[in-house]
């Protein structure tokens, strides 16, 4: 999969449409106005933006934010993101309240080389998610060169991630996309062994293809989170009131059998009547009483998983081990984050992806001790299972 990169493109004097992933959490500032709550994804796009500006291109940034349902929503405007970006790059960042159209084209054509503009939320137009040809064409009309740097949205065939590239002569990978693909290709296609994968989260159904793929590639696949209870139930364990995908029991059984011993499941659990901060939490081994639900992996499982991770040469993690945003049920996820960092310190190549996992890394102070922190959740899973990413497939072959 060799695609054009920024190194292959002369952007001087060119209008460069950069699809970034500025789908960031918003907060409220002291004066009541919206502001950026976490700028990790914005910072991740800076190398590409800086390259275009430093090489005399006009940077035209497009992104989605949230789920406005194909119509304008003032609460999901990117205006405050433009302000935040300006402080990061120490440049004026223009903002357009429109995404496409004659007015936007006129503003862009009047921009000087080395300047930047952020256009309004692409999802304010229903044509974005529908990958509408008219909307994709309107985006293409704004630029001479297209660059996709939004790995977090690369698994979606939307107008700004895939459709627009069909109407551009030059469509290239951004720096972030290059880094993501390089790191994840190493994990998927040429991992050093032993390889350990850790998957958590709530649903088996969200990760079917990834579980299948990793159970073939990895030496050990450690399962946590609510989806572990679906597996435990099909193996005959009592899981109490734990969340189970009843319509996926047969699928989970097939996956477990096909994995031929690769999958490891929790042996003890932190349980309570509800996932609440003031709930009475306790640890049970084996079966879970009927009135209780499993909400985190227990200490014995933490020790076992940590040992596996520390023995790995390659380790990849996606998904929390429990309801980590509630303190009594955060220990398992925090322990995995710390074990990942320790394994990296010992020489392992580590990859962490998915919003919850990355958030846990940050909370534990381990985010700078990981080989590669991915900006993708769904895109990471799609890539690891070997499925094509529309946002990459649409780009110009090198």
From Swiss-Prot:
One of its GO terms (cellular component) is cytosol. GO terms for biological process: gluconeogenesis; glycolytic process. It is found in: Cytoplasm. The keyword Transport does not apply. It catalyses: (2R)-3-phosphoglycerate + ATP = (2R)-3-phospho-glyceroyl phosphate + ADP. Keywords: ATP-binding, Cytoplasm, Glycolysis, Kinase, Nucleotide-binding, Transferase. Pathway: Carbohydrate degradation; glycolysis; pyruvate from D-glyceraldehyde 3-phosphate: step 2/5. Pfam families: PGK. Gene3D superfamilies: Phosphoglycerate kinase, N-terminal domain (3.40.50.1260). Its EC number is 2.7.2.3. Its main location: cytoplasm. InterPro entries: Phosphoglycerate_kinase, Phosphoglycerate_kinase_CS, Phosphoglycerate_kinase_N, Phosphoglycerate_kinase_sf. Substrate binds at residues 21-23, 41, 64-67, 123, 156. ATP binds at residues 207, 294, 325, 354-357. One of its GO terms (molecular function) is phosphoglycerate kinase activity. Belongs to the phosphoglycerate kinase family. Monomer. This is Phosphoglycerate kinase. It comes from Salinibacter ruber (strain DSM 13855 / M31). The lineage of its organism: Bacteria, Pseudomonadati, Rhodothermota, Rhodothermia, Rhodothermales.
């Amino acid at each position: 999969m060799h695609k054009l990169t920024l190194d292959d493109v002369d952007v001087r004097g060119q209008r460069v449409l950069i699809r970034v992933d500025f789908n960031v959490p918003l907060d409220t500032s002291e004066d009541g106005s919206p502001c950026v709550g976490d700028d990790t994804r914005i910072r991740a796009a800076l190398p590409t933006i800086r390259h275009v500006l430093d090489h005399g291109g006009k940077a035209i940034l497009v992104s989605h934010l949230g789920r406005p349902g194909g119509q304008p929503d003032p609460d999901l405007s990117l205006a405050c993101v433009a302000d935040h970006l300006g402080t990061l790059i120490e440049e004026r960042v223009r903002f357009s309240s429109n995404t496409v159209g004659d007015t936007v084209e006129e503003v862009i054509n009047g921009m000087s080389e080395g300047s930047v503009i952020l256009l309004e939320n692409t999802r304010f137009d229903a044509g974005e998610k529908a990958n509408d040809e008219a909307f994709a064409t309107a985006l293409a009309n704004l630029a001479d060169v297209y660059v996709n740097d939004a790995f977090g949205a690369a698994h979606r065939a939307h107008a700004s991630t895939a459709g627009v590239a069909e109407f551009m002569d030059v469509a290239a990978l951004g720096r972030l996309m290059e880094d993501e693909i390089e790191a994840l290709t190493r994990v998927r296609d040429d991992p050093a062994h032993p390889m350990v994968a850790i998957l958590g989260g709530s649903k088996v159904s969200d990760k079917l293809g990834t579980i299948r793929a990793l159970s073939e590639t990895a030496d050990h696949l450690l399962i946590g989170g609510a989806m572990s209870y679906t597996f435990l139930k099909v193996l005959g364990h009592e899981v109490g009131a734990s969340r189970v995908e009843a319509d996926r029991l047969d699928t989970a059984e097939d996956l477990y059998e096909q994995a031929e011993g690769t999958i490891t499941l929790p042996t003890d659990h932190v349980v309570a009547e509800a996932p609440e901060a003031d709930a009475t939490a306790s640890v049970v081994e084996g079966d879970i009483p009927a009135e209780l639900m499993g909400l985190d992996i227990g200490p014995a499982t933490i020790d076992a998983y940590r040992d596996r991770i520390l023995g790995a040469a390659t380790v990849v993690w996606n998904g929390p081990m429990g309801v980590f945003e509630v303190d009594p049920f955060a220990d398992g996820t925090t322990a995995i984050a710390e074990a990942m960092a320790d394994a990296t310190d010992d020489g392992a190549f580590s990859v962490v992806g998915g919003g919850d996992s990355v958030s846990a890394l940050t909370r534990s102070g381990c985010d700078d001790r990981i080989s590669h922190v991915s900006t993708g959740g769904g895109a990471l899973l799609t890539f690891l299972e070997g499925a094509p990413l529309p946002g990459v497939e649409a780009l110009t072959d090198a």
